[in-house]
Amino acid sequence: ASYPKAEIVKCNDIMVDLRKIKSENEIACLREGFRIIEIATDEVIKALKPGVTELQMVGIAQKVIYEHGAEYEGLPMYVFSEASTRHAISRSRYREIGKNDIVQLNLSAKIDGYSPSIGLPVCMGKLEGERRDLIGYLVNRLTGYFLSTIRTMRNTHASEQ
């Protein structure tokens, strides 16, 4: 009612473009988050062994991020293995991790509102046969995708200069 002639305009594209540009302070927050996540990842991998549960591993990650100064989980953290990885959206459970399981880690740490995260697979045994072929295929596809995306971003950035 204060501005009866005001026009409401969507500015999603403007905000997305502005959010791509990070200040030195924002980059420092992201780096600190990644530093903490790296410590948490190392601790989870050290503790991973057959018989531990997915939730126990999440607990280790949570303990580490808080001990090292994170204000919260940046994104929901999870540790999935085998059957739990069949769904795009799942939850860590009291499922015990098995001897030859492939375990998916996704860990994050929020620093001053910035939420970097790292996701990676860990194999609990020797990766052989069809499983190795499948993982190799996925790595090649993802590597190609990421390299293509990076090239596109660089070209777009260069043309905007």
Q: Model-found features: residue ranges?
A:
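Active-site neighborhoods and metal-handling regions in enzymes and metal-associated proteins
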Residues: 1-161
